[in-house]
Amino acid sequence: MQVQCQQSPVLAGSATLVALGALALYVAKPSGYGKHTESLKPAATRLPARAAWFLQELPSFAVPAGILARQPLSLFGPPGTVLLGLFCLHYFHRTFVYSLLNRGRPYPAILILRGTAFCTGNGVLQGYYLIYCAEYPDGWYTDIRFSLGVFLFILGMGINIHSDYILRQLRKPGEISYRIPQGGLFTYVSGANFLGEIIEWIGYALATWSLPALAFAFFSLCFLGLRAFHHHRFYLKMFEDYPKSRKALIPFIF
């Protein structure tokens, strides 16, 4: 059965992402995981970090990958399938690589449920739009928006992966202590890993030139930017010798 594009759920999903991003800024509190786990009640149920991240991120890969699996296989098919493939690439890494290498603290179960719901909804939104709604001109692969967007996506993913590697090296298996991250973009900002992911989704929004991707990029900027800000405050409070020239998210600016 052929699926027809319906604009109403696309608009509703995009509006929800924008609202969630704005809500994160309005509340202005860090999500209670990682460095900020203490913000939750001690009795809160927690899962090991690796299992938690795997379960939370899996829908963002499985849902769009399932949609892609129903499409004809082609390396350079319709732009929507290629762009959704980039989305799947990011979440393949987050689900099957990042989660298994994670050395973080146990993750609150309530946040896993929220994260899983978000990842499922966003995976459906991005996949549905790109496969069933998006229309691109014949020359989209040579359009500057596609080229620059894919470049930013790959650049951001590289920054994100490299920054996560630096963070993992700060802690031996079983350790829960914190150290000052050094190297890479951590030389300039406290949230280098967050900056990389924000760049990724800005690139994705540019390459797809779509409302759902733009809404997701806005949400990522709000949520991850706020988390970078709180990480920066955490480091300044914990380490007296923390580099004063280092910013939270944007080198030399913020």
UniProtKB/Swiss-Prot annotation:
Changing L89V: No effect on affinity for testosterone; no effect on affinity for NADPH; increased Vmax. Changing T187M: No effect on affinity for testosterone; increased affinity for NADPH; decreased Vmax. Optimally active at acidic pHs. GO terms for molecular function: 3-oxo-5-alpha-steroid 4-dehydrogenase (NADP+) activity; 3-oxo-5-alpha-steroid 4-dehydrogenase activity; amide binding; testosterone dehydrogenase [NAD(P)+] activity. Keywords: Differentiation, Disease variant, Endoplasmic reticulum, Lipid metabolism, Membrane, Microsome, NADP, Oxidoreductase, Pseudohermaphroditism, Sexual differentiation, Transmembrane, Transmembrane helix. The chain crosses the membrane at residues 8-28, 72-92, 146-166, 206-226. Changing C5R: No effect on affinity for testosterone; no effect on affinity for NADPH; no effect on Vmax. One of its GO terms (cellular component) is endoplasmic reticulum membrane. It catalyses: a 3-oxo-5alpha-steroid + NADP(+) = a 3-oxo-Delta(4)-steroid + NADPH + H(+); 17beta-hydroxy-5alpha-androstan-3-one + NADP(+) = testosterone + NADPH + H(+); 5alpha-pregnane-3,20-dione + NADP(+) = progesterone + NADPH + H(+). Changing G34R: Found in individual with micropenis; uncertain significance. It is an enzyme of class 1 (oxidoreductase). PROSITE patterns: S5A_REDUCTASE (PS50244). Pfam families: Steroid_dh. The keyword Oxidoreductase applies. It is a multi-pass membrane protein. GO terms for biological process: androgen biosynthetic process; androgen metabolic process; biphenyl metabolic process; bone development; cell differentiation; cell-cell signaling; dibenzo-p-dioxin metabolic process; female genitalia development. It comes from the Eukaryota. Its EC number is 1.3.1.22. It is linked to Pseudovaginal perineoscrotal hypospadias: A form of male pseudohermaphroditism in which 46,XY males show ambiguous genitalia at birth, including perineal hypospadias and a blind perineal pouch, and develop masculinization at puberty. The name of the disorder stems from the finding of a blind-ending perineal opening resembling a vagina and a severely hypospadiac penis with the urethra opening onto the perineum. Converts testosterone (T) into 5-alpha-dihydrotestosterone (DHT) and progesterone or corticosterone into their corresponding 5-alpha-3-oxosteroids. It plays a central role in sexual differentiation and androgen physiology. Belongs to the steroid 5-alpha reductase family. This is 3-oxo-5-alpha-steroid 4-dehydrogenase 2. It comes from Homo sapiens.
